Amino acid sequence: MTLPVEPNAKRWGWAENCGGGDFLMWKDAQGRYQEMKGTRTDYRAHGPCLTDVSYSEESSGGEIAARIDVSVPAANDHLRTFLRLRYDVRKPVRWQRLAFFQLGADFYNDVPARRVAIGNVTGLREEWEPRRVKDEYDRPALPLTGEGTWISVHGVEREALKKGHAMASRGLIVRSWRAVLGGKSAAPHVSTFGTEWGKGNHKTTVELSPPPGLTELQPGDFVEAELELVIFPADAAAYYGPDNALRDLLTREADTWRPVHCEAQGNALKPIAKRGEITRSYPLVITVDDEQRAQVIVKGGLGHVPVTFSGLKSPKGHLVLVDGQPVTHWQTDWNAATKRWQIVCNVAAGEDSEMEIVLESTP
């Protein structure tokens, strides 16, 4: 819900994409870009509460197999996109450049943001202005440490924005990370890479990278990660949605690293299951118990939290309650892998308060 940069912009109109990005980006040791092939798409849920799409593919020589799950929840504050990555190395891999994920791709990165910051749920670790260079790294392989590590790309150069583009700051939050690279356990690392699209048109691409000193991936290596991509209006006046908490945050801190940190911290949920089993904390997924019921306590959160009740034998005969009040808007999907149904809804977060979410059976 962000107005584009143009005179007489209207609500609910079209705004250009605010970023671009890419999954596995690999240039081999000779600098040749290695395309992925055999992409297979599985549309498991179309929304409206939470989409769920999976992409499976492999590199052109079969060196790396990739699976990417992408979900976008309903929201009235700002865009969140949930990404689950799994890369499996099948053959030795060497590279001139390798990125497990890019925020802003080499040839799709429209917002002229001039500052980058990194941190975790406790706050800021470092902020800097990347060098304006062409096809070289500004800073390679910085370790991301702590819980809920994040990267913010902000400081938009307003004079460089094109008419009709949305002015946005962007962020990437690493919700979980597990990797073996070069036969050893590896933490996440971030690199900043400079590009130039025509004279003086510099952009910065943020990449999740291998650790420094690593030159080859071996068969059996893998990366498994849960990421959250977020986009915020870089101008508080451009936001026309109903979320007062976001509006207040933007009024104070728009186009800084603080909105990304706020999201990383505010949605680092630690729910407690009274019935059923929590299989994912955010977005929240609960498997029902043997009686097809679930009960979970959630404290805090920002925006609307996507909640999925999985393991249902039937799509009918269920009632979702939040603090005793029925939820009237949800979606029901068939899970072909488990051969069970699931119900998905979006629950308004309690910020600093505690809420009880219950799935009951109806007569």
Indicate where each model-derived feature is located.
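Short beta-strand elements of extracellular/lumenal beta-sandwich folds
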Residues: 82-88, 290-300
